[in-house]
Amino acid sequence: MGRRPARCYRQIKGKPYPKSRYCRGVPDPKIRIYDVGMKRKGVDEFPYCVHLVSWEKENVSSEALEAARIACNKYMVKSAGKDAFHLRIRVHPFHVLRINKMLSCAGADRLQTGMRGAFGKALGTCARVAIGQVLLSVRCKDAHGHHAQEALRRAKFKFPGRQKIIVSRKWGFTKFNRADYTKLRQEKRIVPDGVNAKFLSCHGPLANRQPGSAFLSAGAQ
């Protein structure tokens, strides 16, 4: 008996059904890697960011996420280089899909049990996606922005429904706009923290600050 097509589980029905001590025997999801490329590059290295956003409320299978990751990664490595981008999968397949196996071949009518015990057994996993939720994100340099958009366009064919490619106005994966990030970085009010950045607010101990100034000046070391 082959794998049931994912179109049978596309619509979101009922409550989430995650893996737990009551829901055992769940197959491992097909996607195991969620960060691809130069994931250790600092926040200042890749200012450009583009997202693949879902425009429907639906279930996305783990097989589709893995296929999209492979397609996007393959094009970016071929066109921009393996050291020129950071791809991140933004959704995780935590919802468990069930199947009530029914033998439909000839001569199998004596083996079927109909609707007796029809709750079903675990078949696979999927991600429950809302409208406007980000599926994939790519950060890179400005020179490779068109390659990132083309990579997400190719990955879009692996998903059901409608998706949109949106160029972010933020700096990389941070929450700061590009103009604000540059300004705050010059004022030393932002500290790089891996792929993200920490904002230094007015709160906290004042032991290391000069009297009369809440922040250190840009020229101070």
Swiss-Prot record:
InterPro entries: Ribosomal_uL16, Ribosomal_uL16_CS_euk_arc, Ribosomal_uL16_dom, Ribosomal_uL16_euk_arch, Ribosomal_uL16_sf. GO terms for cellular component: chloroplast envelope; cytoplasm; nucleus; ribonucleoprotein complex; ribosome. PROSITE patterns: RIBOSOMAL_L10E. Component of the small ribosomal subunit. Mature ribosomes consist of a small (40S) and a large (60S) subunit. The 40S subunit contains about 33 different proteins and 1 molecule of RNA (18S). The 60S subunit contains about 49 different proteins and 3 molecules of RNA (25S, 5.8S and 5S). Belongs to the universal ribosomal protein uL16 family. Keywords: Ribonucleoprotein, Ribosomal protein. The keyword Cytoplasm does not apply. The keyword Ribosomal protein applies. GO terms for molecular function: structural constituent of ribosome. This is Large ribosomal subunit protein uL16y. It holds the Pfam family Ribosomal_L16. NCBIfam families: PRK04199.1-4, uL16_euk_arch. It comes from Arabidopsis thaliana (Mouse-ear cress). GO terms for biological process: developmental process; response to UV-B; translation. It comes from the Eukaryota.
